[in-house]
């Protein structure tokens, strides 16, 4: 067996165990990451759902109105007598259905300008 010099002995004693320790450390880090992925620990940090907003109103909004070309203003009245508490904004009004878009039918509060005997019927 050959006799190792002092430099070779230093390398064999310190560098070899250092390489083994580095390999063990890398292996432990890999196993820790694998365990985190298996138990979905990272999912508790991320936001996975899309945020949504629902607007509610406590009081009845301002009654919509229609103005003709000659400047006459008519108040639009919903033909139904009951409202839900959910108000979906100016374009959709009250939503009385459980799902889907709602088409609102309005009638005017007074007879039309030409006095035909029937109020205007508007659909939004």
Swiss-Prot record:
From the Swiss-Prot or TrEMBL record, give the protein name: Non-structural protein 4
Q: How does it sit in the membrane?
A: Single-pass membrane protein
InterPro entries in UniProt = Corona_NS4
Listed A to Z, the keywords are: Host membrane, Membrane, Transmembrane, Transmembrane helix
Q: Which family does it belong to?
A: Belongs to the coronaviruses ns4/ns4.8 protein family.
**Does the entry annotate any disulfide bonds, and if so which pairs?**
none
Q: Where in the cell is it found?
A: Host membrane
Superkingdom of origin organism: Viruses
Cellular component terms, GO, for this chain's entry? host cell membrane; membrane
| Entries under Pfam families matching the protein | Corona_NS4 (PF03905)
Where exactly are the transmembrane stretches of this chain?
A: 12-32
